[in-house]
Swiss-Prot record:
InterPro entries (alphabetical): IL-1_fam, IL1/FGF
Superkingdom, taxonomy of origin: Eukaryota
Name of the protein in its database record: Interleukin-36 gamma
Coiled-coil spans in chain: none
Subcellular location as annotated: Cytoplasm; Secreted
Family under the similarity heading: Belongs to the IL-1 family.
GO biological process terms on file: inflammatory response; innate immune response; negative regulation of myoblast differentiation; negative regulation of myoblast fusion; positive regulation of cytokine production; positive regulation of interleukin-6 production
Organism taxonomic ancestry: Eukaryota, Metazoa, Chordata, Craniata, Vertebrata
Length: 164
């Protein structure tokens, strides 16, 4: 069962992304390092990236009952997460892209979309382009990545802290 949409889409008559922070169940936050998002232990000396989130404008054209289709980006630098096949494997990458440009595109930009599902207090992010592949984290200092090994070795459950 999915919770109601936690994101606002209309503020002052226009679409505006929500902002927040993400950390995994091991209390590792996402930071931007060497052109990648890596996880490090949460502490007062660490400044996590600010994630930007916007729902897909055309959810009816995507699979239903999978969660809320969202675009997921970061601020400073403005980049968005996307999925593409690299050497035969679905891969999570960052691309210089403005989240509002993706939102206003005349059709869903599937490589940039993730099904966001909330269960209790945690969230999962499943690739729309590669169903069954989830954003995951592992050891400290390693980049976040895509995995199809749901619940085996990697953290696929995250806390998403939306700032108002």
């Amino acid at each position: 069962m999915f919770s109601k949409h936690p994101f606002s889409t209309h503020i002052s008559g226009r679409e505006t992304p929500d902002f927040g922070e993400v950390f995994d169940l091991d209390q590792q936050v996402w930071i931007f390092r060497n052109q990648a998002l890596v996880t490090v232990p949460r502490s007062h000396r660490v400044t996590p990236v600010s994630v930007t989130i916007l729902p897909c404008k055309y959810p009816e054209s995507l699979e239903q009952d999978k969660g809320i289709a969202i675009y997921l980006g970061i601020q400073n630098p403005d980049k968005c997460l996307f999925c593409k096949e690299v050497n035969g494997h679905p891969t999570l990458l960052l691309k210089e892209e403005k989240i509002l440009d993706l939102y206003h595109h005349p059709e869903p930009m599937k490589p940039f979309l993730f099904y966001h599902t909330r269960t209790g207090g945690t969230s999962t992010f499943e690739s729309v382009a590669f169903p069954g592949h989830y954003i995951a984290s592992s050891k400290t200092g390693n980049p976040i990545f895509l995995t199809s090994k749901k619940g085996e070795y990697y953290n696929i459950n995250f806390n998403l802290d939306i700032k108002s």
